[in-house]
Amino acid sequence: MKFITAILVIFCVYLLSTAGDSKILPLKKLPSKIFGHLKSHVDNTVKKPLKVFGHLKSHVENSVGPLRMNKLTPNCIFGVKSMSMVLFTKNIPDGKYISLDSDLGRDLDLTKTIYFTAHGFISNVNHSLSNRLSRALVEKDYTVFSLDWSDAACTTGGLPLVKLLGYPSAVQNTREIGNLMADYVMSLIDHGASLRNMAFIGHSLGSHVCGFASKKIYESGYGKVPLLFAADPAQPLFQLKQCPDRLCDTDAKLVITLHTSQIGLGYPIGGLDLYFNGGFVQPKCHLDITCAHIRSVLYLINMVEKKCSFPGIPATYKQILNPFSKFPYPNSKTTDCFVMDDSIFNPRRKSLQNLAGGIYYMFVDPDTFCTRKNFNCQR
């Protein structure tokens, strides 16, 4: 029953996401070769290889006869069929798909901070908030690689209602997508990029993708990703899993988790767990879980676009779960508070690793989804 409820909620997310899609970038189904890492999939129905990041591997997808099954079912149930990267820079504000033949030397400044973003279930890089987040980070003079794993995330193919039934497949695909993302990151490092200048942002299922990518990078001997933002990491089919099979606080030097809805993992999962407005219901969303779920991305965007800051005070998970808990708004005399603003996006910030870990109740203005600017309190 809980799974069915979760599926219905996810369908609402789908309806919301399709309503807000941006048409700025053309969605390409065939990803490209990257730095010599090649993965080939063969689809017998079209007799063409599909190139995907990774090492050489062959996969055969059987034909289902005159009526193509993927006309009715989402592509995600067939496994990882394709993925690609979109590069955003100051000179490429609209983003462009990257292939092996692209001369990244013209577009990529390896001295700048590089962000990798990963969308969630039934979404893509064209989604309005995903695109807006990438553009906002570029305005801070960061380089952004936006991972498009829409085929494996059940975005393409199939009927809307049937796509929801593909959620378990999308969950299963997060590990392989994460591994392929790691291959891409390691290729960049092999060609001169520094892991110390990199950070990840994942929303919902994309948070777990970033977690799996970080795990592989570390296990491959490249070190730990400095900073990983998990925007309301997906809960369905992850809530009972242990660290090896989901996002974990050890995946990066600092994992910052933004909790905003009931569809996200409610229990602490990062090195710094931030419960915005209590972590379950957001201002003006009321009981709309989909609104609260995507609000985690909007808060990140607001920090960059509007220079918002969000003050928080220490809390326990028991206090967070208690609907009768009261949290006093901090002031200049408050101690042990935490203020989150756009400075937190810099993975090279010296004080980043000194941030007090733990759980914080984060205050959100009900009208502006922001809080006081230049807010200070005692540390």
Swiss-Prot record:
Please list the reactions this protein catalyses.
a 1,2-diacyl-sn-glycero-3-phosphocholine + H2O = a 2-acyl-sn-glycero-3-phosphocholine + a fatty acid + H(+)
Write the protein's name: Phospholipase A1
- Record's signal peptide: 1-20
Q: How is it modified after translation?
A: Contains five disulfide bonds.
Q: Which GO terms describe its biological process?
A: killing of cells of another organism; lipid catabolic process
The disulfides recorded in the entry are: C76-C154, C243-C248, C285-C291
Name the active site residues: S204, D232, H293
Supply the residue numbers of the propeptide(s) excised during maturation: 21-73
What does the record say about tissue specificity?
A: Expressed by the venom gland.
Q: Which residues are glycosylated?
A: N126
The protein's role, per its UniProt record: Catalyzes the hydrolysis of phosphatidylcholine with phospholipase A1 activity. May act as an allergen and induce hemolytic activity.
Q: Where in the cell is it found?
A: Secreted
What EC identifiers does the entry list?
Answer: 3.1.1.32
UniProt KW keywords: Allergen, Cytolysis, Disulfide bond, Glycoprotein, Hemolysis, Hydrolase, Lipid degradation, Lipid metabolism, Secreted, Signal
InterPro entries, per the entry: AB_hydrolase_fold, Lipase, TAG_lipase
What's the source species' lineage?
Eukaryota, Metazoa, Ecdysozoa, Arthropoda, Hexapoda
What the record says about family reads: Belongs to the AB hydrolase superfamily. Lipase family.
In alphabetical order, the GO MF annotations are: phospholipase A1 activity; serine hydrolase activity
Tagged with keyword Mitochondrion:
no
**Protein species of origin:** Dinoponera quadriceps
Question: An example Gene Ontology cellular component term from the record?
Answer: extracellular space
